[in-house]
Amino acid sequence: MEEETVCKNWFMRKSGKSWIFGCAVFFVLGLATALPVAAEEISQTTAADTAVTEVRTEDSSQTSSQETAVTETTQSEGTASKQLTTPAVADQTTEPTDNEPISSSDGASSPYQVTDTTEPQQTLTPADSEPQAKADVQQAAAPKKEEINPVTNLEDMSHDTNGTWEVREDGIHSNAIGKGDSFLYSQSSGKNFVYATDVTFKQNSGAAALVFRSNNDSNNKNMYAVNVDIGGHKAKFWRWVDNKDIQLIDERDVVPTADNRYTLKVVAVNNWISYYVNDILMASTGDYVLQKADKGQNTVIPEGHFGLLNWNGDMVFQNTKFALLDDTTAPLIDNITVRSDRGNVEKQGQFFSEEPLHIQYVSNDASQVSLDIAKHNPAATVTVEDKTGRVYTDPSHLPVNVGANYFTVKSTVIDSFGRTVTLTYRINVHRRQNDEVYYNELYRDQYHYSVKDGWANDPNGLVYYNGVYHLFHQFYDDTKWGPMHWAHATSTDLIHWKEEPIAFYPDSNGYMFSGCVVVDEHNSSGLFKTAKGGLVAIITANGNGQRMELAYSEDEGKTWQKYDRIVADWSNDPLQNQDFRDPKVFHWNNQWFMVLAGGPLRIYSSNNLKDWKVESTYPDLHTECPDMYPIVANDGVLKWVLSRGGRFYKVGDFKQVDGKWTFIADDAYKDKDQVMNFGKDSYAAMTYYVHDFGTETRPTIPKLTEVNWMNTWEDYCNLVADTVGQDFNGTFNLNLDLGLINENGQYILTQTPVKAYDSLRDVNTALHFKDVTVDANNTLLKDFKGDSYEIVSHFRPDEKTTKVGFNLRVGNGQATKVIYDLQTETLSIDRSQSGTILSAAFAKVNSQHVTKNADGSIDLHIYVDRASVEVFSKNNTVAGANQIFPNPEAVGASIIVEGGKAQADISVYQMKTIWTDKKDTAKPVAMNTTTAKELALQVGQSQDLQVYLAPASVRQDVEWTISDPSLVRTSQKGNVLHLTAVKKGKLTITAISKENPSLSKTFTISITLNNFKTNLKGLQSVTGKWYVDDETLYDSNTSSNDYYMASQKPGFKEYDYDIDLKYQRGLINLFVASGNIDPSQAYSVQFGDSETVRLYRFAGDTIAEANMGKRINDDQYHHIKVTKTKNSIIISVDGQEVMSHNFDQVDSYFNDAYVGLGLWDGAVEFQNFFVTDHATTPKPDSDPTPQPDAPEALAQERELIDPATGVRVILQKGELASIVRVKVSHIETNDAHTPAVLNAKDYDLFNITPIDKNEKVVAITKPATVLLPIDAGKVVDKVVYLPNTDKEENLPFTIVSLTDSNGKKQSYVRFTAEHFSEYGLVYQAENQTNLKSKEKQDNVAISYPLNLEQEVKVSSISRKYAANKTADVNSVQQTEPSVMSSSPKATLPDTGDHKTDLSQLGVLAMIGSFLVEIAGYFKKRKD
């Protein structure tokens, strides 16, 4: 046996954020041939290279300093051998040679001790026992793994070289302080399991994690991890995909413990993963009750190894054990059935036993319900908990309120180690309103389908199968958008619909975004038991990007089985755009095709619906909800229509180009689209799948029908229900049959309401006017009353007529106008006076250019419903749809004719309701209001409070009660209370139905004094809930833009804009120059939660940015002055100028502008808002004389260098010569001020500010070249620009290497900056000396060709530029370029033969000493 050698002469140096460490003995004695490298740079060491082992001292209770050189380990049948471990001290870490375990030694203070040895492993034996006794003990212990290692049942443990790991009697000790991630791997693995540990932190820093389903490959990590971060008391759950970490939850708070001990537990059952900390649920894939934010993933890793992870901590893991689960032991629930003795339970949907969510609807009289829970494991204990935290062991007679009632159902078993294993389900028992409420709502359309309760948007999965139309759609049980489900409705005639149970819930792959359903009639997918196939759904799973998952149904959509593999993911798409959604699939030419977008359009193909390949991509054609289908036109030609979300369309051909199926737009559509619907409220159009389209030679094109969602994402969709006071928010447009006509050589789409709507006409009450003469004074419809009707009209105007059309839903000063303007040939819908106006965008007139018929006539076919208007014209080639919310009493109509006269044919049909379960009632069943329930008034202001009783046909008799009548002066007229604020204070006013006193609405009103100091006239809230209290203007909002504008212009071309603001959160906008009171594209100054001030065009591009040198988020008022001249803007904060920008040109309104304020997603207070004439404003004395060394513009390039950080900025010729230096602040990984987008990343962040000789900030006028230094030994993943702390923009960059006169090299990233702010380097998670990353990353060319990767020699920078820190670029001289390899096969340099003879050891020793000396060079400059 060779003599053991213990290394004690360790060195360790900092290089950037990495440690270089090694042992000089290695170089002298030749026990290893590898040179010391940074721990994070080892590219060839895998989990198997480094092993963990238990080593026992002779007497663990003694405090001897004697080191035990060699000990023995036990290995019995069924028990993994325990190999050597590194000691639990941060400064004693060895680097293993190939195929050898890490070895070292430790004092006798621990019961398990590590030795450094190259000998074969010995058995674990008490040092005071005889050899035979050792064998007896070993044999006796063999069957009981826990007796050999009571702290863990992980087998064949190993770890990486970052930090130390040691198994002792009291646990697995690990120290990785300052080392970043330190992994412990094992050969134990599992698919379904419970895996837990008790971790105790020795210090209040670092994070401890369970690693599971791991591939045990530190160079290409694919695994899951859950952790507790002791410093921030946060829990995380994430996954690595090819070394890229993907967060699966938002960080969650963890309640601190007194002893710093936490129990981490993972329960995994196939795709469902749950994570508990101290038995509190932190994560559950698909559980939107726990977390609403989308955090999806690609195909779930089905199984893998167990491990541990220590991040920068010193900790002990105890009871680290896993127990496998199978079909008999997992605490699954097979079904939860809701029943009620008091009311009806609606049809139950499919219960997914391996998903956490389920919804069950019950009738209004079901005020109590019972849960019948079918346990899959009879040994499980089940408890039910309501939202208040009350726990029920007997889930019967559970009280439920009207609306959503979420119950938490926990199923628990005990594993072999005595630990609880729990799966947590949520069941939402949704109790309906009274039956009389439904379909009597004031704004419930009567012949447009809408969701009964909750939210609905995009139609999905439209399919006609076995005589039934299926309409799936996006759904959430709330009145605003949320975690997406697929709801389901069926019909046999496209007008009468039946709600079915919810079809799909969010799952581990993400939330259920839009998709489609096809009929796999020949079982091409192989998913079905028989050749006749069935329905296949292709669904977008959203979260961390987007992907497609499949589900299939063999019972006509009643139940579904999800396919266990993601069939297409954005990460594999050539466009590399995360917007990868809304698939629409069709069958053509004997294969499946899929169009999808969400961003850029793509077309894929497949033979089996499971394996998809890219056919063609369209990076410049962006849309949502694409659809593509063939139509045989009226001339017999087959053409293809590309629908862009139901908003616009193109017509062309679908054919192979270079072997790839491609949509080729006709010439008329190459550079433009046609409008599909000019109204705001028609979106996400989809056609019903009927059958195979056939082939090119034998097409079988069915009649195609589409439907749209009647709303828009552009502005107000989430406002509808709350504003008009209803419990549903989701209506769909009319079903339309599609066609194509050839019009003057261009194919035009026709959209015609399906014939079935004719059956809803009440022909007995219809009005028919044939060839009547109408003019501006006509009274043809003076006696008409209706809220749901159809108008079919044909106008033949005379030569003087300028407009024809209709006033719809007329009354109480309200009307919605549908007008054809003969002079401009424009068809429009004007709802600016239609009643309740949801937003400024809602009030805008929507229109489209439409030519008259060939004979000069105009056709207007209009469908009016309680809350919508749809118009069709020009042989149904033109369509427009808008929502409206008029006063329920506005039921009149009239004909519009202006300028002259017209002959007209007009028919008006009252429309019957489609709601077969609507209850007729003569008494009020609901009270609505379109007035906000919380109001802020100023003394002297007036407000109308109005309520409506439903149905609209009942008497609107209400009484009003006022809590403090002294504060207001009131008058009542019917269901309207007019009030005027007379005194400061707060009061409540309640409206009560006289006929049904159970119906009421209460308004809370705060009355303030307006002492806001300003010289601006007409200051008013354009959007938002701004209010003044005394001298302060307040506003707050969530995820919206609020505007507060002066209705009159200041009247000056040059002015000073002064205001005091107290920042609280969000983004504050100062509209310095706007073209009108809608500040779109206004010249704006923006402040946020950072040191950066931004000058930009509102809703447009950034103009310039500057660093203020401080943040203004200190809850104090800060004075902002913006000086606007004819062509410049100067910004000062608290008297300090922070930005000066000159414009080459400005918009015409820049010097005749409106001003105002804005807020995005935040809260703010303002005081003292004044705009004064700059020409009369006293100006401080200044010395305008230019310095001789500062010409107006640079005659040549100038380089500015910051010696402290090494940042270099190269200014272009022609740049302002007043810029003489750059001011740079720098933060790096784990800094307390780390921006949110850089959390958990390895980065360097530089805030760069150009400065003039007076230390004033100067904005650059031309793009500048920037060089940022790279930490030695690290690989740059990306270069980012941070416009604010919650957003990053990736920049293209190249790598250069500079060499100074002393021969020292430094690598930099080089990129172009349009303006200066915060720029950062983000390093790869696994940094290595040699590149092992992808050759190409987003916006980055990593191939480093000769012309990009340059080595440059410079003279001694610090001496040459110490005075003014500037230099001409010409002083930097280039030498021969060097090339950095980016080959994925790059490895560490060859360290020689392991059998190197002793004649080489002297050379190795010299190299070792040399490395010790130069290690310090790689330290950061600031260190």
Swiss-Prot record:
Region (Disordered): 44-161, 1368-1394
Pfam families xrefs: Big_2, Cadherin-like, Glyco_hydro_32C, Glyco_hydro_32N, Laminin_G_2
Annotated GO biological process: sucrose catabolic process
Induction of its expression: By sucrose, fructan substrates and fructose.
Membrane topology: Peptidoglycan-anchor
Residues annotated to bind substrate: W455, A456, N457, D458, Q474, F513, S514, R581, D582, D783
Annotated positions of the Pentaglycyl murein peptidoglycan amidated threonine modification: T1391
Family: Belongs to the glycosyl hydrolase 32 family.
Protein name: Fructan beta-fructosidase
